[in-house]
Amino acid sequence: MSDYIVRATAADANIRAFAVTSKEMVENAREDHMTTPVMTAALGRLLSAGAMMGAMMKGDKDIITLQIQCSGPAKGLTVTADSHGNVKGFAMNPQVELPLNAAGKLDVGGALDLGILTVIKDMGLKEPYSGQCELKTGEIAEDLTYYFATSEQIPSAVGLGVLVDKDQSVKQSGGFIIQLMPFTPEDVVDRLEKKITEIDSVTQMLDRGLTPEQILEEILGDFGLEITDTTETRFHCDCSKERVSRALSTLSKKDLDSIIADGESIEVKCQFCNKAYEFTVDELKEMR
């Protein structure tokens, strides 16, 4: 199993935790979207978060979407995940080039800058659940911590990291989400808060070769950690010519007529994976 998510509990089920390794998923996204290192890190962090938040969904057909709209040069990010470990995503501007930040790290916060994080959960109900918060730092992990606290009222610790190699490929990628359940004893809360301040960053843990299980062991080993589930995860786009055709057929007759009048076949690319689909003039005429 290459990329996978582990789910766990600790402190007599007062703590629930998720951790993921996502190197191949993020490398696939990098290759599909030809992202620069800073955008590989930005999209990679959100893909890791999406994978874990997808694993929180209970229904077979549940879908979660994480959207960031921002004022920085990245312009925005979108990630969609299901409850089976299938994740896809894209950056509005995958070609952002920025100098390293003051700490000598890839400047994800600079690429995103100010903005809004929106989480949409489609659980097959009439209306999807939607929660929103402002970006606190643009570094994504802190923004999600803030989202969980304000929109879902769940005290959480989120850690996300992507290591980019000298050749711009993904060296390591992963993360964790640790959440406190209601009525967690105060001493457990205090001990966990202290522990979170003492641990290495996710990138340091990944660079040491730690697996998701070992990352959770490092954080929750003193809390009676119990791994409850392991799920494979991957970058997977479910686009098809039929789906793209359905999207095209929603264009107005005027717009379709204009495309047809050009007399040439058109190429439409999937935003999530960059796969190109060609439609002939005859195919376009059938959509009117």
Swiss-Prot record:
UniProt KW keywords: Chaperone, Cytoplasm, Disulfide bond, Redox-active center, Zinc
Pfam families linked to this entry: HSP33 (PF01430)
Taxonomy, superkingdom: Bacteria
InterPro entries xrefs: Heat_shock_Hsp33, Heat_shock_Hsp33_C, Heat_shock_Hsp33_N
UniProt-listed GO biological process terms: protein refolding
SUPFAM superfamilies found in the cross-reference section: Hsp33 domain, HSP33 redox switch-like
Protein name as annotated: 33 kDa chaperonin
Similarity field: Belongs to the HSP33 family.
Gene3D superfamilies noted in UniProt: Hsp33 domain, HSP33 redox switch-like
GO molecular function, one term: protein folding chaperone
Record has S-adenosyl-L-methionine as a keyword: no
Cellular compartment(s): Cytoplasm
Positions of disulphide bridges: 237-239, 270-273
Post-translational modification: Under oxidizing conditions two disulfide bonds are formed involving the reactive cysteines. Under reducing conditions zinc is bound to the reactive cysteines and the protein is inactive.
Primary localization class, coarse: cytoplasm
UniProt function note: Redox regulated molecular chaperone. Protects both thermally unfolding and oxidatively damaged proteins from irreversible aggregation. Plays an important role in the bacterial defense system toward oxidative stress.
Key word Glycosyltransferase present: no
GO cellular component, one term: cytoplasm
